[in-house]
Amino acid sequence: MLKNDLFLRALKRQPCSRTPIWVMRQAGRYLPEYRAVREKTDFLTLCKTPELAAEVTIQPVDLMGVDAAIIFSDILVVNEAMGMDVEIIESKGIRLSPAIRSQVDIDRLIIPDINEKLGYVMDAIRLTKKELDNRVPLIGFSGAAWTLFTYAVEGGGSKNYAFAKKMMYREPKMAHMLLSKISSVITEYVLMQIEAGADAIQIFDSWASALSEDDYREFALPYIKENVQAIKTKYPDTPVIVFSKDCNTILSEIADTGCDAMGLGWNMDIAKARKELNDRVCIQGNMDPTVLYGTPDKIRSEAAKILKQFGQHTATSGHVFNLGHGILPDVDPANLKLLVEFVKEESVKYH
């Protein structure tokens, strides 16, 4: 039995004594303890070494008091498992090769044996669960098909997604073939994470805002729904969070995927989102990550505002406090600790 199950209760929209909190990229460079581990090895080796991945996954639980851990990994391990070379060079960026630009390139990508290619993630999950000793839940995750597609086709990050959109608009069947291939791997990957012990899954569609509403409906949402429905069919009790960054105009359609919770970017009023969704799903978010550069008073006032905007809880509401995107690497850890402690205290009156 979990000693602290507030995060899972909130995702399932069950009564909670307060609002749970964790933050995206909470195991990361803002922590001196993470940097000490990271100095010994490169980023991908850290992801692939279960003992080290477990250590950094647990750091924010020990140091910050967050209500959930998220397994330390990277969304691009899926691309790598499918046969792409992935280089992640902090401060320089991401390179994937060869970029996927033709039918021949798509055919060359493999549907991997997840245990063989991504077994290190499952080992890290099992080890982390053991070391957490039921203190808090553990989140598993994957990138969404559209986001992984953009990295594959662009060969890295991009400002305007020219190659990805060129394939979408000139060769839509080819684009769907690649998206479908990626999505099938994502589905197997997240199911195996749950089998290994993940208590919840988050699907990150980090580049969702690059698409128009209509294009998102065609090239992104069907694959997210495919992933969510596969999880719900096999593991109906495992909550799923969908984080489609800045897709504020189609919130109800994202909820229609069958997800339990929706991550919200910071440019959406959480009160409006709750009103539109009518407590059909839990809402996760949504403080601007740069607020953590502010004074203690500013951090407290912004957090208080979000809690107040979400408002009083009902028997069917759910809110997980988080940032609207990942914590930035040069944030003072003391500011995150202050935020966590404040949310724990301030949120009680809304429950």
Curated annotation (Swiss-Prot):
UniProt GO molecular function: uroporphyrinogen decarboxylase activity
Chemical reaction(s) catalysed: uroporphyrinogen III + 4 H(+) = coproporphyrinogen III + 4 CO2
PROSITE patterns, sorted: UROD_1 (PS00906), UROD_2 (PS00907)
UniProt KW keywords: Cytoplasm, Decarboxylase, Lyase, Porphyrin biosynthesis
Pathways per UniProt: Porphyrin-containing compound metabolism; protoporphyrin-IX biosynthesis; coproporphyrinogen-III from 5-aminolevulinate: step 4/4
Protein's UniProt keywords contain Cytoplasm: yes
This enzyme's EC code(s): 4.1.1.37
Highest taxon of the lineage: Bacteria
Residues under site feature: Transition state stabilizer: D74
GO term, biological process aspect, one: protoporphyrinogen IX biosynthetic process
Localization, UniProt: Cytoplasm
Family membership noted in the UniProt record: Belongs to the uroporphyrinogen decarboxylase family.
HAMAP family, per database record: URO_D (MF_00218)
Function of the molecule: Catalyzes the decarboxylation of four acetate groups of uroporphyrinogen-III to yield coproporphyrinogen-III.
Subunit structure: Homodimer.
Protein name: Uroporphyrinogen decarboxylase
Protein's organism: Chlorobium phaeobacteroides (strain DSM 266 / SMG 266 / 2430)
Gene behind the chain: hemE
